[in-house]
């Protein structure tokens, strides 16, 4: 059986609001859609943190658990938890094999965390990952820049995923949006 992959996650901080959106498609290999309603965006740490994944589903669940443990260990300090998780992820021979990326955010900070040790905070308050990530990122930047006073963070996140879903075959329109 081939690898199962999940696709597009988009996150935005906008006008004091924050939102994260993910589509629901899980694809096996390059040919078969196995699930349309996967939930790839989750609330962690008593609902104060949002986390979303793109990549191998089983690997992502492992990383969610590991990140949640780090959040508990560092009392909700998002940046410290992300850095410590990235160090552990990169430093462990078995964990390095995990194929997933995470976006994590709270009301003030948004970070991309990868297995190669990167913990990146965007300059513009927008991140997107997964096969449709570049499409969602482009759409989100345009929406934030040109329609910012008319749209909420939730509306920008949802619209960015809808545009990615129109373009990327690995992204569907079953969109889950979480807000903080």
UniProtKB/Swiss-Prot annotation:
GO biological process terms, semicolon-separated: proteolysis involved in protein catabolic process
E.C. number: 3.4.25.2
GO molecular function (one): metal ion binding
GO cellular component: HslUV protease complex; proteasome core complex
Keyword Cytoplasm: yes
Residue ranges crossing the lipid bilayer per the database entry: none
Alphabetized InterPro entries for the sequence: ATP-dep_Prtase_HsIV_su (IPR022281), Ntn_hydrolases_N (IPR029055), Proteasome_sua/b (IPR001353), Proteasome_suB-type (IPR023333)
Location(s), subcellular: Cytoplasm
Catalytic residues identified in the record: 7
Description of how activity is regulated: Allosterically activated by HslU binding.
Function text: Protease subunit of a proteasome-like degradation complex believed to be a general protein degrading machinery.
Family stated for the protein in its record: Belongs to the peptidase T1B family. HslV subfamily.
Oligomer and partners: A double ring-shaped homohexamer of HslV is capped on each side by a ring-shaped HslU homohexamer. The assembly of the HslU/HslV complex is dependent on binding of ATP.
The protein's name in its UniProt record: ATP-dependent protease subunit HslV
Organism annotation: Bacillus cereus (strain G9842)
């Amino acid at each position: 059986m081939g690898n199962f992959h999940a696709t597009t996650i988009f996150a935005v901080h906008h006008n004091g609001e924050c939102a994260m959106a993910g589509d629901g498609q899980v694809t096996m290999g390059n040919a078969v859609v196995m699930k349309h309603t996967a939930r790839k965006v989750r609330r962690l740490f008593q609902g104060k943190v949002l986390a979303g994944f793109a990549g191998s589903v089983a690997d992502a669940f492992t990383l969610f658990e590991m990140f949640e443990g780090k959040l508990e260990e560092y009392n909700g300090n998002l940046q410290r938890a992300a850095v410590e998780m990235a160090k552990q992820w990169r430093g462990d021979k078995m964990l390095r094999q995990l194929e997933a990326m995470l976006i994590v955010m709270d009301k003030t900070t948004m970070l991309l965390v990868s297995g190669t040790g990167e913990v990146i905070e965007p300059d513009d308050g927008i991140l997107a990952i997964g096969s449709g990530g570049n499409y969602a990122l482009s759409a989100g930047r345009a929406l934030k820049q040109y329609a910012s006073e008319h749209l909420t963070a939730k509306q920008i996140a949802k619209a960015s995923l809808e545009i990615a879903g129109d373009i990327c075959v690995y992204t569907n329109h079953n969109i889950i949006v979480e807000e903080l």
